[in-house]
Structure formats: C-alpha cells, structure tokens
C-alpha cells in the first residue's frame, strides 16, 4: 500500500470523530503513506474535517458542496417529570447521590440555560477551526464560520482542484513517487 484515497459524500457527523480521523491519518503518514481526499457530492462539517486532514483534496463536480465548519447541538429538552401528552408516559431522571454534576449542562438546557453546552460547543469549534487552519493554511476566516461553498469556488483554499477518482489514484502514485 502506497497511500489512501478517502472518498467523501457526507453532510457531517459528530465533532468528536475529528480526533479519531486525526489519529488514523497521522498513523498512516508516520508509515510514509500519502492520503488524497476525493469529494463526490458533499464534504461538510465533520466530513470536511476528514478532507482537511488529507494531503490533497479534489472534487468531482464544481458544484460539490464543501465547508460548514463549525459545531452545533440539537436536543430534546425533556425535564424530569415531563409527561408525554399522547402516551401519558412520564419522563424521569434519577441520579445517584454521588453524581450531582452528571448531565448538569443538559439539565440546565432543559430549563432554558444553554451556557454550559455553548461553552463546550465553543471549545470544540475553536479546536476544529484550528485544525483546519493548520492543515489548510490558505483557508479564509470567512470559510471557518459555518458557511458552505461550491467546491469550484474555493480552489486553493479549501480544496486543491478538480479530478475524478482515477485522477486521485494517479495523484497518490505521484505523491508516493511510484511510476504509473
């Protein structure tokens, strides 16, 4: 194996996945492997995090979507004692005496106080943005604000160019110094 192509078509996922991606790709690099990202559709949020970690990134269609760099959280705000109006089931949370801080931020959010969760989101967002800045040094500040872009409009910053899968195979070979 001389390298890897990571094919991407994803709107995103868990921001925590970034850490696993980073460990896996750094391990491959430590073994001298080249990594090329290939976007065929969408590379947004956590999907773009994986692309940013690649040595080079190419897209199939200039209208493929990239970006959405940022973090968010969606949650149901059930509170202890809430009753489902359809089933009449009661939501209950019971905590051990030794766990007063367990889910504290989520319980606060159910009461309308989002500061604890927002603090965590801000930390994860800053870490995500820093990783993208390090791996894609020409990315603009505006491209780190959660916006999405047509891949053809961000060549040189978020992506390296246009190429099909065969092109990406050739790039891995070239980067690895293997004749074709």
State where each predicted segment sits:
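Short, well-ordered alpha-helical microsegments
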Residues: 46-47, 151
């Amino acid at each position: 194996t001389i390298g890897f192509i990571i094919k991407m078509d994803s709107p995103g996922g868990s921001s925590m996945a970034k850490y696993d991606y980073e460990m896996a790709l750094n391990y491959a690099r430590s073994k001298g492997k080249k990594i090329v990202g290939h976007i065929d559709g969408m590379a947004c949020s956590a999907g773009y995090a994986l692309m940013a970690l690649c040595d080079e990134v190419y897209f199939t269609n200039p209208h493929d979507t990239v970006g959405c760099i940022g973090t968010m959280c969606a949650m149901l705000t059930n509170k202890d004692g809430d009753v489902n109006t359809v089933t009449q089931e009661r939501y209950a949370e019971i905590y051990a005496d030794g766990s007063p801080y367990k889910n504290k931020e989520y319980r606060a959010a159910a009461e309308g106080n989002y500061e604890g969760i927002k603090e965590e989101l801000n930390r994860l967002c800053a870490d995500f943005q820093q990783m993208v800045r390090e791996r894609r040094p020409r990315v603009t500040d505006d491209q780190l604000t959660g916006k999405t872009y047509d891949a053809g409009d961000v060549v040189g910053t978020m992506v390296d160019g246009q190429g099909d899968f065969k092109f990406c195979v050739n790039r891995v070979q070239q980067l690895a110094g293997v004749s074709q």
